[in-house]
């Protein structure tokens, strides 16, 4: 029989839902055209081979970028849902946001586990007065995270974006990893070849200070896992309130994925863009339903007071917010400080 603590951990893991889904280049929406699609939106273990990209399906395309471009990667809780009504990664899954890149021969077929990854963007604890995390900044901006492409030699690369959720990271194995990858071709006259690289898995250990971390104890700093970023300064922790105003124009956020892909390329010989005919869907005629009496439903009184949404916090030591959940969710304890609607 599983222990109560292990059941709480499994409940917290099951509640975590988010994947990286879209890419933008200088404000142009590239959608999922060069995304390595994830099999599902569950977190990845620190030692799993899926930690590299969490990829189930590779893309036949690469998106073209160059040094100095502003690249935005986009995360959402459910696949295909680009609305800002729901947090990109909810349930107070606070922690760092990082972006890595790796030079490869052909981004369309490259083995992400064999790649040499260098970091190009990071943010951990944005402020300690009050504590404000990179994930909160991500959520403020409807799941959009923007970085500048550093000086890089031309060629194919993989982009790896990542969230580490620390809400149950106070014990070994509690940190939850949400990576995702995009396939790109860097053009231009750059010459940079980063040398401080890591492998995934292998870049992090379960006992690293930024992986094994109790976010419910008073903390004034946070050590971001992984190497120092290339082409930009390491992130710092502010001791003044972090601005919560979105820098991304959420009012212009599209609700669908674009049907026209951005320019593609594959090294020296760009691959042809092929048009795939829509699948032919066949179905059997519906079987008439059998007649039966409807079940007798006994109405229940709706819960009173303010209700928390799915994955939102609903209890825990020091919590003063809603303690009841919107139907059909129930308030479930992850630990003594954090309960959420599952």
Swiss-Prot record:
GO terms for cellular component: extracellular region. The keyword Zinc does not apply. Disulfide bonds join 63-181. The modification Phosphothreonine is found at residues 19, 57. It is an enzyme of class 1 (oxidoreductase). One of its GO terms (molecular function) is cellulose binding. Glycans are attached at residue 189. Gene3D superfamilies: 2.70.50.70. The modification Phosphoserine is found at residue 59. It is found in: Secreted. CDD domains: LPMO_AA9 (cd21175). Keywords: Carbohydrate metabolism, Cellulose degradation, Copper, Disulfide bond, Glycoprotein, Metal-binding, Monooxygenase, Oxidoreductase, Phosphoprotein, Polysaccharide degradation, Secreted, Signal. Has a modular structure: an endo-beta-1,4-glucanase catalytic module at the N-terminus, a X282 extension, a linker rich in serines and threonines, and a C-terminal carbohydrate-binding module (CBM). The X282 extension is a highly conserved stretch of approximately 30 amino acids mostly made up of threonine/serine which could potentially serve as O-glycosylation or phosphorylation sites, while five conserved prolines could confer rigidity. Belongs to the polysaccharide monooxygenase AA9 family. This is AA9 family lytic polysaccharide monooxygenase AA9-X282. It comes from Coprinopsis cinerea (strain Okayama-7 / 130 / ATCC MYA-4618 / FGSC 9003). The lineage of its organism: Eukaryota, Fungi, Dikarya, Basidiomycota, Agaricomycotina. The gene is AA9-X282.
């Amino acid at each position: 029989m599983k222990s109560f603590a292990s059941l709480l951990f499994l409940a917290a893991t099951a509640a975590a839902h988010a994947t990286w889904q879209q890419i933008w280049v200088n404000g142009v929406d590239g959608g999922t055209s060069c995304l390595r699609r994830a099999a599902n939106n569950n977190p990845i273990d620190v030692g799993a081979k899926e930690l590299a990209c969490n990829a189930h399906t590779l893309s036949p395309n690469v998106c073209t970028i160059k040094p100095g471009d502003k690249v935005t990667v986009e995360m959402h809780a459910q696949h295909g849902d680009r609305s800002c009504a729901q947090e990109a990664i909810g349930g107070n899954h606070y922690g760092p946001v990082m972006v890595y890149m790796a030079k490869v021969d052909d981004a369309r077929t490259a083995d992400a586990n064999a790649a040499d990854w260098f970091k190009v963007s990071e943010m951990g604890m944005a402020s300690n007065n009050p504590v404000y995390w990179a994930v909160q900044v991500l959520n403020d901006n409807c799941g959009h995270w923007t970085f500048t492409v550093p000086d890089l030699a031309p060629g194919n690369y993989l982009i790896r974006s990542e969230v580490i959720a620390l809400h149950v990271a106070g014990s070994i194995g509690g940190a939850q990893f949400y990576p995702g990858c995009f396939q790109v071709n860097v053009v231009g006259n750059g010459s940079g070849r980063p040398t401080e690289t890591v492998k995934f898995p292998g870049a992090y250990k379960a006992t690293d200070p930024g992986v094994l971390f109790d976010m419910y104890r008073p903390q004034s700093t946070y050590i971001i896992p992984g190497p120092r970023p290339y082409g930009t300064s390491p992130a710092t922790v502010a001791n003044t309130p972090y601005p919560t105003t979105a820098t991304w124009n959420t009012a212009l956020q599209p609700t669908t994925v674009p049907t026209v892909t951005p320019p593609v390329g594959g090294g020296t010989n760009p691959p042809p863009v092929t048009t795939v005919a829509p699948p032919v869907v066949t179905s059997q005629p519906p079987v008439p339903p059998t007649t039966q009496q409807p079940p007798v439903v006994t109405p229940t009184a709706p819960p009173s007071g303010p209700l928390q949404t799915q994955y939102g916090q609903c209890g825990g030591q020091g919590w003063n917010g809603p303690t009841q959940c919107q139907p059909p969710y129930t308030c479930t304890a992850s630990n003594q400080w954090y309960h959420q609607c599952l």
